[in-house]
Amino acid sequence: MSGQHTKEISDCRFASADLQYNSDKSKIYNQKSKIIIMSYSEKVIGHYQNPKNVGTLDKSAKNVGTGLVGAPECGDVMRLQIEVDDATGMITDAKFKTFGCGSAIASSSLATEWLKGKSVDEALTIDNMDIVEELNLPPVKIHCSVLAEDAIKAAINDYRVKNGKEAIKFEESVVH
C-alpha cells in the first residue's frame, strides 16, 4: 500500500456507485480515482462474510446479560448478549446483532467467539486492542473494537445487576 493514499469513509455503508471491491473483496476502492479507500484483513472479511453467533437470546432471562452500545458519528450500533451458567459462572453462549460497517460486524463476531467458555471475570479481560491485533484493523476502524469491548462490559453489567450483584464501574467510551 506504500505510495497510495487511504482515506476514511465517513458513511460506513459504502453507498456510492463509484466504490467497488477488488476481485478478492479485500480492498474497497474508488473506481474513478483508483484510490484504495479501505483495506481489510482476511480475518475481517471472513467474519464479515460469515459472521458467527448472529442472533438474540431471551433478554428477560435472569442468566442473560444484554449490552447495547453505539457510535452516532458512524452509525454503528452493537447489541451483544451473553448467557451464563449460574452454577459455574461460565459464559455458555453469546449472540450479537450489529448495524454497521464490516469492521464493526467482524469485531462483534470475534468477541462472541472469544466469550464462549470464559468465566464472567475472564470476559472482562478482553480488551479492544486484542481485537484490533487479531483482526488487524486499520487505525480508522479502532472505534469498532472499542464498541465490542464496551458491549461486553455492558452485557456483563446487565447480567450482574439482574442477579443482585454490584455493577462493574466503566464508562462507555466516546468513539470518534
Language-model region placement:
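Short, thiol/selenol-centered motifs that function as redox-active sites or metal-ligating centers
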Residues: 74, 98-106, 144
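Long, acidic, intrinsically disordered low-complexity segments
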Residues: 50, 56, 94-102
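Glycine/charged-rich beta-loop-alpha catalytic/anionic-binding loops adjacent to active sites
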Residues: 85-96, 129-134
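Structured beta-strand/loop patches that form or line metal/cofactor-binding pockets in enzymes
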Residues: 51-91
